[in-house]
């Protein structure tokens, strides 16, 4: 028997139908000599610090550097502790039993870094030694599965891919766990999350926000003139920018005194616009955010759904090109789109046209080619799924269409010693722009009459126009994805920039999750389409902006090294040692940092140790030093103590009279709270001596 393991049940069902495994069992399908089973995402992951004997947040534990990482089943939180997910444990037992019985394994998890890691972690956790081969396909159509099964690849070919994925996973653990604990300890106020990619991304958002808000606009003035010829009116702006209205007005008077505009020059040229490349995941996410207002995470989810519905190729691709053999399939995909009403006419016209070969380059195809529609027409898509499908289909038609040809005209006019310019454009051949029929964005090109050098035109109107300089815009998800993708190009150090010029931070598959993490941590929020930091996010940024943890250059360099591990050009063990040194450095930096975040607005020193701060939480207030152990429960006698009451209690030893406590019988009473010598909390009744009572008891 051969076992095929897919990444999720829906994919396993599609593979099972192709190989004839139709008998359903608990956790797998069987038949025709196959057992087709599945994971559901990461069944196995890296153990948390508690597994290595490091409980709580303690300075003396840091940095936590396990000699060997332990693998554990995926865990769920129950109360204050994490336990193995029962469903995951059951499926792992199914996999153990199947692996024990089988002759060999066919790995059919997603053909990428994370898919490889999902299988290898399970394989290693179960201690399996059975031989395995790889099903490496770029779509889930029956045709692709059959072809992939005929061309199974040796599992060892993907050892470097696994080592890269493993190195990334361990680096994220080392940096994330240690930096988060270090900053939380330094803050003495709650728990703060940092990460290898998360924190530089937050820094990008915050630095742009600060730059935008601190920008001081500068006013300037231009002169606008209007003229007409052959019934076509047009306007032009002065090339000169005036710093003040008085000077601009003086220039305007000189222009008006002449009453005529002279055509100084007319330059005409033919402009050829190549079609855009096919989408990779990041390009799709950027355009879907700009045109549909979809988040990066939503776009990935929709693309994954279309992939599993067999109408889209593998979505987590970082390539915008296809290979020669895939190019041979493009005519049939174009023919298929003739059956799709929106694209029928364009597809029919393109079928009889030589296809543009710009997206065809074997050398630029990574693990997977660019996003394409498959040979299956979609049915029953949701409105959002249809929108993403149509974007990919339209881009396929655009990418293989002829280029767009325009005649560009630039005219210079003169009057009163000032030069005025205007640009015009006439489309001679729409080419790829005919697919969606959309005009160019952010391009102002007027329709101009036929103008000749040295001719003069009457000045019809003139005025001064007030303008002002503009800051860089706040980041949107689209612009942030671009910044994450191309940050290596922005590096100031020339030698370093050359070394990592194409490096970004994160990968196409992980960038959406990084952005969502920043939302989940309450570090950023949406303001319409813009991403803006919260007070908490800015406080974290101000603390780490000059630290290694926020260094975009360093993070981009790590990404470059991880890519080299995948190709065998770098050593995973050396990378691990470098990350451990880096982790120790950021821990030292963060432990000495000061983070000014006090969500409750109240701060006070612990009355017991008299050194650390009191942390305020929903149900308790406690000392930041876990060794001190001072804890005060907010619920006392049926009342929830406010931050102000707690501060008064721990700083003066008692509160004012509080009304409305209730005893065990439900009767109401009034009392002040007092802090006893053993640091428990008791009641002090009016005109009576204090009565000690443990803070967990009610009276």
Predicted segments with their positions:
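Conserved short loop/turn motifs at secondary-structure junctions
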Residues: 1, 109-111, 188-191, 268-277, ...
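Intrinsically disordered, low-complexity regulatory segments
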Residues: 1-169, 173, 471
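Basic, low-complexity terminal or inter-domain segments flanking catalytic cores
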Residues: 2-3, 81, 88, 125, ...
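Amphipathic alpha-helical transducer elements in NTP-driven molecular machines
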Residues: 9-16, 33-36, 40, 59-62, ...
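Short strand-coil-strand connectors
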Residues: 30-32, 226-230, 414-418, 665
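C-terminal or mid-to-C-terminal helical accessory/interaction module adjacent to the motor/catalytic core
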Residues: 87, 100, 140-227, 268-269
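Metal- or metallocofactor-binding catalytic centers and their adjacent structured scaffolds
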Residues: 243-279, 285
């Amino acid at each position: 028997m051969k076992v095929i393991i897919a990444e999720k049940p829906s994919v396993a069902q599609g593979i099972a139908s192709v190989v004839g495994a139709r008998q359903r069992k608990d956790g797998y399908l069987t038949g025709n000599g196959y057992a087709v089973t599945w994971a559901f995402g990461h069944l196995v992951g890296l153990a948390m610090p508690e597994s290595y004997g490091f409980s709580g947040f303690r300075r003396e534990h840091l940095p936590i550097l396990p000699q060997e990482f332990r693998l554990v089943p995926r865990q769920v939180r129950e109360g204050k502790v994490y336990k193995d997910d029962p469903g995951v444990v059951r499926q792992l037992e199914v996999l153990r039993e199947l692996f024990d019985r089988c002759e060999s394994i066919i790995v059919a998890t997603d053909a990428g870094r994370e898919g490889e890691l999902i299988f290898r972690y399970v394989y290693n956790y179960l201690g399996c030694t059975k031989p395995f081969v790889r099903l490496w396909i770029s779509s889930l159509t029956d045709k692709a599965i059959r072809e992939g099964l005929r061309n199974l690849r040796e599992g060892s070919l993907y050892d470097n891919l696994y080592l890269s994925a493993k190195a990334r996973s361990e680096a994220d653990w080392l940096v994330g766990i240690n930096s988060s604990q270090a900053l939380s300890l330094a803050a003495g106020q709650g728990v703060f999350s940092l990460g290898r990619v998360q924190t530089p991304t937050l820094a990008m958002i915050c630095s742009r926000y600060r730059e935008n808000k601190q920008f001081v606009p500068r006013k300037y003035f231009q002169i606008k003139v209007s003229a007409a010829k052959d019934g076509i009116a047009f306007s032009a702006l002065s090339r000169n920018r005036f710093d003040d209205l008085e000077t601009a007005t003086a220039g305007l008077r000189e222009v008006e005194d002449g009453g005529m505009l002279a055509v100084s020059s007319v330059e005409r040229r033919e402009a050829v616009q190549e079609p855009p490349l096919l989408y990779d995941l990041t390009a799709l996410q950027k355009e879907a955010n700009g045109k549909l207002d979809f988040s990066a995470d939503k776009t990935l989810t929709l693309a994954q759904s279309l992939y599993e519905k067999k109408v889209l190729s593998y979505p987590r691709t970082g390539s915008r090109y296809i290979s020669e053999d895939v190019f041979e399939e493009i005519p049939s995909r174009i023919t298929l789109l003739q059956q799709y009403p929106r694209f029928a006419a364009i597809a029919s016209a393109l079928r009889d046209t030589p296809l543009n070969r710009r997206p065809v380059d074997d050398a630029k195809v990574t693990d997977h080619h660019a996003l394409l529609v498959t040979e299956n027409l979609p049915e029953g898509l949701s409105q959002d799924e249809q929108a993403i499908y149509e974007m990919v289909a339209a881009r396929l038609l655009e990418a293989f269409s002829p280029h767009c040809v325009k005649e560009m005209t630039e005219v210079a006019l003169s009057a009163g010693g000032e030069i005025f310019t205007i640009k015009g454009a006439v489309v001679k051949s729409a080419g790829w722009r005919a697919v969606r029929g959309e005009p160019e964005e952010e391009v102002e090109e007027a329709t101009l009459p036929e103008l000749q050098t040295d001719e003069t035109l009457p000045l019809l109107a003139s005025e001064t126009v007030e303008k002002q300089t503009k800051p860089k815009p706040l980041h949107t998800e689209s612009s942030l994805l671009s910044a994450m993708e191309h940050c290596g190009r922005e590096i100031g150090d020339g030698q370093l920039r050359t070394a990592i010029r194409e490096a970004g931070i994160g990968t196409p598959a992980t960038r959406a999750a990084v952005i969502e993490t920043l939302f989940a941590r309450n570090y950023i929020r949406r303001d319409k389409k813009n991403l803006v930091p919260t007070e908490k996010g800015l406080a974290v940024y101000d603390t780490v902006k000059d630290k290694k943890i926020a260094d975009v250059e360093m993070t981009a360099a790590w990404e470059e090294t991880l890519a080299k591990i995948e190709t065998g050009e770098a050593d995973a063990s050396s990378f691990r040692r470098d990350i451990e040194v880096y982790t120790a450095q950021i821990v030292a930096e963060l432990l000495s940092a000061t983070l000014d975040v006090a969500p409750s607005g109240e701060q006070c020193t612990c009355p017991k140790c008299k050194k650390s701060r009191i942390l305020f939480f929903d149900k308790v207030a406690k000392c930041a030093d876990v060794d001190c152990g001072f804890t005060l429960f907010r619920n006392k006698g049926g009342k929830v103590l406010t931050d102000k009451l707690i501060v008064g209690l721990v700083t003066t030893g008692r509160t004012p009279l509080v009304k409305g406590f209730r005893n065990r019988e439900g009767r109401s009473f009034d009392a002040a709270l007092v802090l006893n010598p053993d640091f428990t909390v008791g009641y002090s009744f009016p005109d009576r001596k204090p009565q000690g009572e443990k803070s967990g008891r009610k009276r």
